[in-house]
């Protein structure tokens, strides 16, 4: 190809003139910087590219919340922070039970039961400094005390932050010890919750130098109590003709009426006129656990760090963190109670105690040094986290399998002998987990002022989960010697207790309790090795820079343990009944490896205006599904099951193309950042659970592809002396780009190799199959089109006092809780924990005002001033429609002291 010399000369002239103008303006800016501009927007330093630099110079979309802003906005945890972060969604069932999503990259979310065993690994990385603390289904709930900042890095960060950063990364950056500085602070607050119990918090920080120029320590201690605000109101639970499992009794109506005088439920095989419950079944009540404001939560923690400066080049930072979180009750409201009664906002009907205990300790270390001209950083960490959670699962009794586990003597119950008998519906699930997470990373980098500069690193990670999860919804008595004798003599039947497989790896081996119907005692995790590099080349120094980087990764993933459930062979069987499945013998192991890369072109039009283009790739590892005896499901029209559930699922991937502007005007009094992106998310990891069609266990498979287009705007303005206005906005348009189907893979089925379109349900009726992957053009979960926030703060002096007034608003657009999976906004008896609901948009308002004098600060604050009870996460996770509402209006006072 012949080049056009005139065009080449024109391009060269334009770039040369831009470079000259840029260098000239840089010199002027440098001279101007010698004069302090008190009205300029404060520069924010981040380490998003593994080096300290001004956030305005980083060619990706970054949102930051500084230490001052964390205090000003009364942000204690991520649930408080997310309202100031457009394009970031947070689906949570309560404290310590959250999933974080960015830019609408979510297949949906569910309850926390079994998430440690079956959930995909997160696609948003969560970091405490340089230590990864992410976890499937329940990201670490870190109280944001004595933090330097929170960084939110949007878009794939796979090159520098690895597999968990497919959609982005969130980094909590702690304050580090300061040499030769003695300082400290203390804050205390008290507030009241509308319609709920009061809240209180105290924290204290001390920085203490021990050896001049060499050693300092920093410690923070905190306690935070948040009062409950959701009432567990008195209720009953009565088995109904319309329950999904009523067919198991084998009773039909007479002249269109059931024995209880009510219309029948849906027809079943052999019962074409509908199904009925028998008379005389027990009615369950919750009088022993009904309570007002039943969902308080307490955080207690301490963090101690020490910095030793060996010389000008080498230092060692050690940090130890402990946190204990204890929450009671349920953090959702039920629009409809367990017996179909309409409830008021902030009410539930729960029948068993519920609580969540979440404790972690984290040790981390960082060595900074220099060898000749090469900067060296070695960092590592070791996290130990344990959780113990119990949740009410009484509404499972209305599902397709509830009566199987809770009744005997019917043709579809676990034991078909003896009189027709049902037991209590008050049941729960109990999930104990232990997570260890060890990481090591070493990075070498050249001086940043070199024209060609680079970063090279190596990474090792060992991530393991132990999960002992028991679904305690079997109320049929266990087969103790006495119960078994009664059953064998013609009395009510019993069901033997389940146990782990004696040949498998088990955290808590042995027989489970009488009420355990199904569960798993398993271990899962991976080891990862990675190498990564990033190289910058200044095409025109200080003006035009080209960056390229890549990461090679290698995952060794495993799963071992035991799974067990109450089969019909447990009927009238001495405790324990036949042992659970041995996962060790299956050999669940997978290896994933490959490269993920990124590239940037950064153009400093002037020192205060930056344009960039970024190409980046992200990924997350695959995983394993439950391996029970129910792996063949979806009975077809010919009576043959059509689908072998996959034993594993593969990684999904994300490709991002992004352009952006970062700029400051009017002597750094106005900041305007704008970005636009086009992303392709392929073969997403899609969780499926449909007891009426696909069996009674959840599994994950690779499903649809999505195309995401969006824009994001961030504004900060120093309008007048003392007045700052800032806001941010995101618009996200995400659509499914293909139309896959669930394909029959059983060679014995007449539909083998074809899309599954019909399935015989547990009641024996042929029904249309749900389009579990959704149609082309469908939208993903937690992907609101529009989000924005705006706030203003005015600071002024009153004599010796410094006063401030701040107010803000936050809007979250409507969104769905699941992908378009063939289910609807259902209120009655959910057939799955993954029903799709629409969550309407909402707007909240906050305000604060205060004064400071010398070392003291006093302020009054209010959050959710409009007292909205909008749902932040709607689901059928506990077999009843539940909505996790915003915390009601909180009004309080905070006092601070620093020295």
Locations of regions flagged by a protein language model:
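N-terminal periplasmic accessory domains that precede
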Residues: 78, 98-101, 114-115, 165-188, ...
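Short acidic/polar hinge/loop motifs at secondary-structure boundaries
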Residues: 114-119, 123-154, 204, 245-247
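Transmembrane beta-barrel wall of Gram-negative outer-membrane proteins
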Residues: 195-327, 361, 434-439, 445-461, ...
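Membrane-embedded beta-barrel scaffold of Gram-negative outer-membrane proteins
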Residues: 203, 364-394, 610-616, 641-643, ...
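Solvent-exposed loop segments that connect transmembrane elements
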Residues: 230-292, 328-351, 392-430, 470-521, ...
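Gram-negative outer-membrane beta-barrel transporters
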Residues: 454-455, 546, 678-680, 701-820, ...
């Amino acid at each position: 190809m012949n080049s056009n010399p005139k065009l080449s000369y024109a391009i060269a002239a334009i770039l040369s003139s831009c470079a000259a103008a840029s260098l000239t303006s840089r010199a002027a800016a440098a001279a101007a910087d010698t004069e302090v501009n008190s009205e300029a927007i404060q520069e924010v330093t981040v380490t998003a590219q593994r080096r300290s630099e001004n956030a305005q110079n980083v060619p990706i979309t970054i949102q930051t919340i500084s230490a001052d802003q964390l205090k000003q906005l009364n942000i204690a945890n991520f649930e408080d922070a997310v309202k100031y972060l457009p394009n970031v969604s947070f689906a949570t069932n309560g404290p310590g039970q959250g999933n974080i999503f960015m830019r609408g990259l979510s297949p949906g979310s569910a309850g926390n039961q079994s998430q440690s065993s079956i959930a995909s690994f997160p696609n948003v990385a969560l970091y405490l400094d340089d230590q990864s603390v992410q976890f499937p289904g329940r990201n670490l709930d870190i109280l944001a005390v004595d933090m330097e900042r929170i960084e939110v890095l949007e878009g794939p960060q796979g090159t520098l932050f690895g597999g968990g950063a497919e959609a982005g990364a969130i980094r909590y950056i702690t304050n580090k010890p300061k040499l030769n500085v003695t300082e400290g602070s203390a804050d205390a607050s008290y507030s009241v919750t509308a319609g709920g119990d009061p809240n209180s918090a105290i924290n204290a920080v001390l920085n203490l130098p021990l050896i001049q120029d060499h050693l300092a320590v920093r410690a923070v201690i905190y306690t935070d109590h948040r009062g409950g605000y959701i009432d567990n109101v008195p209720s009953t639970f009565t088995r109904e003709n319309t329950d999904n499992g009523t067919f198991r009794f084998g009773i039909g109506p007479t002249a269109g009426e059931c024995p209880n005088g009510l219309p029948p439920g849906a027809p079943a095989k052999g019962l074409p006129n509908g199904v009925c419950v028998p008379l005389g079944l027990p009615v369950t009540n919750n009088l022993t656990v009904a309570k007002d404001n039943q969902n308080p939560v307490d955080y207690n923690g301490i963090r101690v760090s020490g910095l030793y400066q060996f010389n000008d080049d080498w230092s060692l930072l050690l940090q130890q963190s402990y946190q204990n979180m204890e929450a009671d009750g349920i953090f959702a409201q039920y629009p409809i109670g367990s017996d179909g009664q309409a409830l008021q906002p902030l009410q539930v009907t729960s029948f068993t105690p519920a609580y969540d205990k979440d404790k972690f300790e984290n040790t981390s270390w960082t060595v900074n040094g220099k060898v000749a001209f090469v900067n060296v950083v070695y960092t590592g960490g070791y996290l130990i986290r344990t959780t113990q959670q119990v949740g009410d699962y009484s509404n499972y009794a209305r599902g397709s399998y509830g009566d199987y586990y809770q009744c005997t003597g019917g043709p579809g119950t676990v034991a078909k002998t003896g009189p027709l008998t049902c037991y209590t519906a008050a049941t729960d699930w109990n999930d104990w987990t232990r997570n260890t997470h060890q990481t090591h990373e070493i990075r070498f980098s050249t001086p940043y002022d070199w024209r060609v500069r680079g970063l090279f690193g190596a990474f090792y990670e060992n991530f393991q989960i132990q999960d002992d999860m028991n679904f305690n919804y079997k109320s049929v008595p266990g087969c103790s010697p006495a119960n078994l004798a009664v059953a064998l003599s013609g009395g009510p039947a019993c069901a033997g207790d389940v146990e782990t497989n004696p040949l498998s790896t088990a955290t808590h081996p042995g027989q489970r309790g009488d009420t355990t119907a199904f569960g798993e005692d398993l271990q899962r995790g991976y080891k990862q090795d990675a190498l990564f590099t990033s190289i910058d080349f200044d095409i025109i120094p200080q003006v035009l820079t080209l960056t390229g980087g890549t990461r090679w990764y290698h995952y060794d993933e495993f799963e071992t343990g035991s799974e067990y459930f109450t089969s019909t062979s447990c009927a009238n069987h001495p405790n324990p009944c036949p042992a659970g499945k041995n996962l060790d013998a299956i050999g669940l192991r997978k290896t994933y490896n490959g490269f993920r890369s990124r590239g940037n072109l950064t153009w400093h039009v002037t020192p205060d205006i930056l344009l960039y283009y970024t190409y980046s790739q992200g990924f997350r590892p695959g995983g394993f599904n439950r391996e029970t005896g129910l792996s063949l499901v979806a009975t077809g029209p010919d009576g043959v099951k059509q689908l072998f559930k996959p034993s594993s699922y593969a990684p999904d991937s994300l490709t991002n193309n992004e352009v952006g502007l970062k700029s400051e005007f009017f002597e750094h009094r106005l900041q305007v950042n704008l970005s636009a992106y086009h992303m392709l998310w392929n073969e997403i990891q899609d969780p499926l659970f449909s007891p009426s069609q696909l069996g009674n266990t959840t599994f994950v498979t690779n499903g649809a592809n999505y195309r995401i287009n969006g824009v994001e705007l961030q504004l900060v303005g120093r309008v007048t002396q003392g007045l700052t206005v800032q806001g941010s906005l995101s618009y996200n348009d995400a659509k499914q780009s293909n139309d896959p189907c669930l394909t029959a893979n059983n060679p014995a089925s007449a539909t083998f190799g074809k899309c599954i379109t019909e399935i015989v349900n547990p009641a024996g009726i042929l029904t249309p199959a749900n389009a579990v992957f959704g149609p082309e053009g469908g939208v993903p979960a937690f992907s609101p089109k529009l989000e924005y926030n705006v706030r203003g703060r005015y600071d002024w002096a009153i004599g010796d006092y410094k006063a401030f007034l701040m107010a803000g608003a936050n809007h979250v657009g409507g969104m769905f809780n699941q992908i378009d999976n063939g289910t609807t906004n259902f209120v009655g008896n959910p057939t799955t924990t993954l029903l799709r609901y629409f969550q309407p948009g909402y707007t909240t308002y906050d305000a604060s005002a205060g004064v400071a004098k010398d070392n003291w600060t006093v302020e009054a604050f209010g959050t959710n001033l409009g007292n909205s009870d909008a749902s932040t996460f709607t689901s059928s996770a506990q077999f009843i429609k539940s909505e996790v509402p915003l915390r009601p209006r909180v009004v309080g006072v905070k006092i601070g002291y620093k020295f």
